[in-house]
Amino acid sequence: MRLSAIGLYFSALAVGLVASLPQHHDIHPRPNIKPAPFDAGKALPYSPPRHPKRRCFVRPGADATRDDARVIYHAFKECNNGGTIILDQTYLISSPLDLTFLRHIDVVLTGEIHFDDSDVYYWAENSFKFNFQNQSVFWKWGGEDVNIYGDLSKEGSVIDGRGQRYWKEIETNKSLLRPMLFAFDGMKGATMSNLRMRNTPNWFNIIANSTDILISNMDLRVESLDGVKIANSDGWDTYRSDRVVIQDSVVLNTDDCVSFKPNSTNIVVQNLDCTGSHGISVGSLGQYANETDIVENLYIYNVSLANSSDGARIKVWPGIQTSFQALLNGGGGLGRVKNVTYDLFRNVNNDRAITITQCYGQKNQTLCYEHPVSVPLPMKPKSKARTHTQQANLTIEDITIKNMYGTTSESLDPQAGTLICSAPDRCSNIRAENITVRVPSGKEPLYACKNVDERLLGFDCTLPAGDRDVGQG
C-alpha cells in the first residue's frame, strides 16, 4: 500500500514529535570495530560521536499493508548531520527508498526491516537500477561518515528481503528483475556491523562507487520453502570501489560468498565462514566488450568454505561474446586481475578448492581458446599492417594461493581444482604454496592446468578434459 499525501504529512509529523520528546530508554552504543588483522592500506576516516539530544526514534504504522518508507525517510532527513536514527520496531517498506544524502549519522537497527513481497513485479519496475548485470535494489545508501549497526546478542537486528516469492516466480519467468537487499552507492567512510540479513531475492549486498567501508560481524542466510531453488544470493559484491574490509561474518547462501566485480581495488576479506556458496570469487570480469575491468590488491585471509562448488575462484569471460543465462551474457572485455592473495584457506567438502578460468560462460572451449580474453581493435591509421589487429588483453597476473587445506567433495574425486588460462601470455606469476587439500578417496589430488607456469605451483598438473566453470553463477 502506497501512502496518500495526507498520510505522508502525518507520518512526517509523527517522526518530528518522536525525535523531540525526551526518551526514557538508552540506545545500543556504537560498537568500536576495527579491521583486524589486516586493513585496506589506510585507516578509516574519523567518525565523531553523535549529538546525544538528536535522536530519531522511528514509529512504524499500524496497518499490516502499510508503507513505512516515508516515515523512515523523514527521520533520516531530521536527524541527518550529527544525529542518530533508532529503528527498534518492525517496519514494512513497500516503495523504494533513496538514502544517498547521508552525512555524519548513526543508524541503530535493533528491530526488523521487511520488504513488501505482495507484488514482485512492482519492485521489478520501481527498484533502483544499476547499469551492471541487470542489478537493482530496494533501497540505496550513500554519503559520508555513516555507521549502521545492530545487536546480535538479542533477537531482532534483521533486514529481510522475503525472497521466497521471487525464487518461485523465476521458475517460470527467468527474466524477472529481482532487487538486491542492500546497496552502498557513493558512500565515503562507513561501517556496517552486527546485523542479520535474511532471504534476499538476489544478491545480499553491493558496495558500489564507494571508498573506506568496513563490514563486520554480519550474519547472512537464505532458506527456501517447498524445495524452491534459491538464485543469485551473493553475500557481498564490490563494484567500482576502493579500500573495503569485510570481516568476522557468517554467510549461508547459494552463490558467491564474496565477489569482486569490475574496478574493485585494495580490498580485504578476512575471518569469514561461508557455507553453500560458489567461493570467494574474482569476477566475473570482461563481460562488456571494450570496457576495462581492473581488480587488484586483494587479500583474502582466514576463510572457511564448506559445501561449496568452489573455494578460491577467478572467473573471466572469453574474448568473444557468448550467451550464458537468461539475463547474463557477454565477453570481449579488457583489463587485468593483479596482486591477489588467498592465504589460510579452509575447504570442507567443496567440489573444487581452486578454480581459475578465462572461459567463463563459454561451453565451446575450442572457441574460447581461439579468442583468448581479448578483443580485436583497429590498427592506428598510420600502420602499414592493415591485415592484422592489435590485441587488448584481460590478463591475470601475480596471484598467490597459499596455506590452503581441508577436503574436497566426492563430486570430482580425485580432481581438486582447475587452473585454466586461454593463452600462455594471458596469465603470469600464478603461484600455489603449501597446498595440502585432500580428496575423499585418499588418492593423490589432481589439478587440471592449461597455459600456466607449472613450475610455480606446489602440485603436479594434468591436462584438462575441459573447463567446468560454465554452469555456475
Write out the residue ranges for each language-model feature.
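Extracellular/periplasmic carbohydrate-active domains that bind, remodel
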Residues: 2-473
